């Protein structure tokens, strides 16, 4: 089982999902501040 293709799949996933999670978390915190 060769894992040579893994970085090419992992890189776009990390670069898209990780900032998306950070932005979603930041958005939720702002929304909670506005509601409260």
Curated annotation (Swiss-Prot):
Membrane topology category: Single-pass membrane protein
One Gene Ontology cellular component: chloroplast thylakoid membrane
Cysteines joined through disulfide linkages: none
Keywords (A to Z) from UniProt: Chloroplast, Membrane, Photosynthesis, Photosystem I, Plastid, Thylakoid, Transmembrane, Transmembrane helix
Cell location: Plastid, Chloroplast thylakoid membrane
Signal peptide start and end residues: none
Top-rank lineage group of the source organism: Eukaryota
Chief localisation class: plastid
Transmembrane region(s): 9-29
Keyword Magnesium assigned: no
GO biological process: photosynthesis
Alphabetized HAMAP family for the sequence: PSI_PsaI
Family named by the database record: Belongs to the PsaI family.
Described purpose of this protein according to its UniProt entry: May help in the organization of the PsaL subunit.
Protein name: Photosystem I reaction center subunit VIII
Species: Emiliania huxleyi
């Amino acid at each position: 089982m060769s894992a040579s293709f893994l970085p090419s799949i992992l890189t776009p996933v990390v670069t898209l999902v990780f900032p998306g999670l950070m932005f979603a978390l930041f958005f939720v915190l702002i929304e909670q501040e506005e509601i409260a």
